[in-house]
From Swiss-Prot:
<comment type="similarity">
    <text>Belongs to the complex I 30 kDa subunit family.</text>
</comment>
<dbReference type="InterPro" id="IPR037232">
    <property type="entry name" value="NADH_quin_OxRdtase_su_C/D-like"/>
</dbReference>
<dbReference type="Pfam" id="PF00329">
    <property type="entry name" value="Complex1_30kDa"/>
</dbReference>
<protein>
    <recommendedName>
        <fullName>NAD(P)H-quinone oxidoreductase subunit J, chloroplastic</fullName>
        <ecNumber>7.1.1.-</ecNumber>
    </recommendedName>
</protein>
<dbReference type="InterPro" id="IPR001268">
    <property type="entry name" value="NADH_UbQ_OxRdtase_30kDa_su"/>
</dbReference>
<keyword id="KW-0618">Plastoquinone</keyword>
<keyword id="KW-1278">Translocase</keyword>
<dbReference type="GO" id="GO:0009535">
    <property type="term" value="C:chloroplast thylakoid membrane"/>
</dbReference>
<keyword id="KW-0520">NAD</keyword>
<dbReference type="InterPro" id="IPR020396">
    <property type="entry name" value="NADH_UbQ_OxRdtase_CS"/>
</dbReference>
<dbReference type="InterPro" id="IPR010218">
    <property type="entry name" value="NADH_DH_suC"/>
</dbReference>
<comment type="function">
    <text>NDH shuttles electrons from NAD(P)H:plastoquinone, via FMN and iron-sulfur (Fe-S) centers, to quinones in the photosynthetic chain and possibly in a chloroplast respiratory chain. The immediate electron acceptor for the enzyme in this species is believed to be plastoquinone. Couples the redox reaction to proton translocation, and thus conserves the redox energy in a proton gradient.</text>
</comment>
<keyword id="KW-0934">Plastid</keyword>
<keyword id="KW-0874">Quinone</keyword>
<keyword id="KW-0813">Transport</keyword>
<dbReference type="GO" id="GO:0019684">
    <property type="term" value="P:photosynthesis, light reaction"/>
</dbReference>
<dbReference type="GO" id="GO:0008137">
    <property type="term" value="F:NADH dehydrogenase (ubiquinone) activity"/>
</dbReference>
Amino acid sequence: MQGNLSAWLVKHALIHRSLGFDYQGIETLQIKPGDWHSIAVILYVYGYNYLRSQCAYDVAPGGLLASVYHLTRIEYGVDQPEEVCIKVFAPRRDPRIPSVFWVWKSVDFQERESYDMLGISYDNHPRLKRILMPESWIGWPLRKDYIAPNFYEIQDAH
């Protein structure tokens, strides 16, 4: 079954893959990393003006990494705004996805957290650096193949 947004993207010859609907009836689409920035701009112009959240996860050990965006189309006088979930998958060896910071500024810290925890590099992000872990930290703690160190060096704040 195809949702409204998927039908609109097909009508305008924009490449994507429909992943169906989640348990709340929200349409989920897969977009290729190379197409993500241009489709993000189109979605913003189409009315998806609110980025509700962005997160990332490790699909499987040795597999792909995913960056997930939850977008909402907020309009005056509409009680049930349209929502869509976009998934962008990247290879583990060189996980690069275009940043959508210049489309939705609210993604700033969320993309930085995804970089810090999973190592996904968001191209053209203005401040892509670690946000939770120290800059000297080695590895990506939320990857399924991450091996936790046996010790942690605690630095004195004084």
